[in-house]
Amino acid sequence: MPKELQVSLLGELRVTSAGTEALLPASRKARALLAFLVASGRPHRRERLCEMFWDLPDDPKAALRWSLSKLRRVVDAPEQPRIIADRERVHFEADGVDIDFRDIHARLRRRAEPLSVAELESMAGQLDLVFLDGLDGAGGEAFDSWLMAERDDVQAARVEGLRQLAVQ
């Protein structure tokens, strides 16, 4: 059964809630911030996020607050906040959320039951998509470096999926 909230990191960032695609903020930085929080799966210091996404001449703390308010409208539900922030840290609460790349990665690593040819072909097709397509340059150098490393991980997962497909 599909979960209430789905986040797709493969291809362009997409968020689907209750079967309806959510309208993401127009700001590429806000979308990149959401993608980073979802993909990393851990809390981040506010200062680090400001450094990753905003230049110092701007007001990075205000820009972060603005972006978080826009993102909460996309992913939070009244009974289930997803963007969790305190004075020090920010993270995305992923419990009960389908995240395409995390799901594929976990299924490829699971050794208890072999995946079918159809599943492996489907995963290979998904992994052919560019991870967070269109978000290049949406943050600073640290974000671009992180994005490049994540794309390398996607490529490694694709190779593993194709390897498993070849031995079927």
At which residue positions do the language-model features occur?
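DNA-binding patch around the recognition helix
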Residues: P2-S8, W66-D95
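Short, flexible loop/turn motifs enriched in small residues
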Residues: S8-L9, R28
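Short, Lys/Arg-enriched N-terminal segment that forms or immediately precedes the first helix
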Residues: L9-A22
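Structural motif
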Residues: E12-R14, G41, R89
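DNA major-groove recognition helices of helix-turn-helix
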Residues: V15, K29-L34, L49-C50, L64-P78, ...
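Intrinsically disordered, charged and Pro/Gly-enriched terminal/linker segments
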Residues: A22-L24, R28-A30, A39, W54-K61, ...
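Short capping segments at the starts of secondary-structure elements
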Residues: F36-R48
